[in-house]
Amino acid sequence: MPFLTALQKRKRVAWAEEFKSFDVHQWKNLIWSDECYVHLDDHSGCVYVTHCADKEYDENCVIPTFKQSSMQVMVWGCVMKGRKRPLAVLEYPGGRGGGMTGQWYISQVLEAHLHTFYDQMKEERPEVVFQQDGAPSHTSKLAKQWLVDHGISVFPHPRSSPDVNPIEPVWHELKKIIRALLHPPMTIPKLIKAVHDAWDALEIPGIDKYVDTMSDRVQAVLKAHGVILNFKYIFVDVLYT
């Protein structure tokens, strides 16, 4: 879980106080967004295989591992109540912080993927607001100015707070689908296809259940005095299914 300073905890409490009265109709107007890395050897979850006693090392009963350095893809996605935009695979620049800069974020995400979707949702839901986390590329002067110039309203999001972004458990679901593949992808092109297929397989009602927990998440932040919520709360499928 992310480390939070005392100041960050206070800011989380202040954020929760500001939005504790939001109802489901107001949360419905938010576009929740995030980047995510998917590794070729991402087996962070438990993987169990049932096999005969003499098949312990059969290639169909084991999961290969790979060097993680180059075998990964970076994706960007956004969801909102009742909507899921097609997943975007991003060019991975590498380096500190993934190599993301304000200009990179503008060209790879805001211009290429968000702009059209936001305008579409604006017609459908006039009070639509865009959420992004506090990554330096997101909060750079260039990115902020681009958002202002294009009339995109931004919802405040406390730093280091994945627990109050309902897209986080959606990533968890996506990776579970990929980990469950009988024949895991062994090349970057196959991994990209697997990621797209997994995203397409995620159903809207399954995403909506996470968005619908926002009021509970806000109250939990207040109750915890700003402390980061336990990851079992982030992955609310443990609690709500």
Region roles according to the model:
Residues 1, 94-97, 176-181:
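Short interface patches used for recognition in eukaryotic signaling and trafficking proteins
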Residues 65-69, 99-100, 104, 122, ...:
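Conserved, non-catalytic sequence blocks in retroelement Pol enzymes and Pol-derived host proteins
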Residues 2-6, 132-134, 140-141, 156-178:
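RNase H-like two-metal-ion nuclease catalytic core shared by retroviral integrases
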Residues 16, 33-34, 77, 130-133, ...:
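Structural signal for hydrophobic/aromatic residues that build the beta-strand cores
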Residues 107-157:
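RNase H-like DDE/DDD metal-dependent nuclease/strand-transfer catalytic core used by mobile genetic elements
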Residues 8-115, 225:
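Extended, low-complexity cationic-aromatic segments
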Residues 26-37, 167-241:
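C-terminal anion-handling pockets and recognition modules
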Residues 35-37, 42, 79, 83, ...:
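Residues that form ligand- and interface-recognition hot spots within folded domains
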